[in-house]
């Protein structure tokens, strides 16, 4: 059976915005669900309009085993703080490591936003 990992990290950063995007902005983002860990990612994102929801639907329809990672979204604002960036990427990397420990992966689907900027 094909096995893929699914996760994401989305933010539209505006370098001219006066307020940086902090960790709490991903915990309580408004509009989209808050930060999701592997255990809640699939059930929470399935009914949304997030791109991951489409990837989940197709993977499940095709009989692909999904290894959920972590998923984060914050509303548009200033650059993502170093703390938030490092914490979220660490969650994704740790979940990916756990998924690989559980068995081989055939692919990784990461929902990313091309306009994200971090402080560093």
Give short role names for the model-derived ranges.
Residues 32-43, 70-80, 113-114:
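Glycine-/proline-rich flexible loop or hinge segments
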Residues 52, 56-96:
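Low-complexity, highly charged intrinsically disordered N-terminal segments
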Residues 1-61:
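N-terminal amphipathic/basic leader segments beginning at the initiator methionine
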Residues 24-28, 64-66, 97-104:
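Short hydrophobic/aromatic-rich motifs at helix boundaries and adjacent loops
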Residues 5-12, 18, 78-120:
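Active-site histidine-anchored catalytic micro-motif
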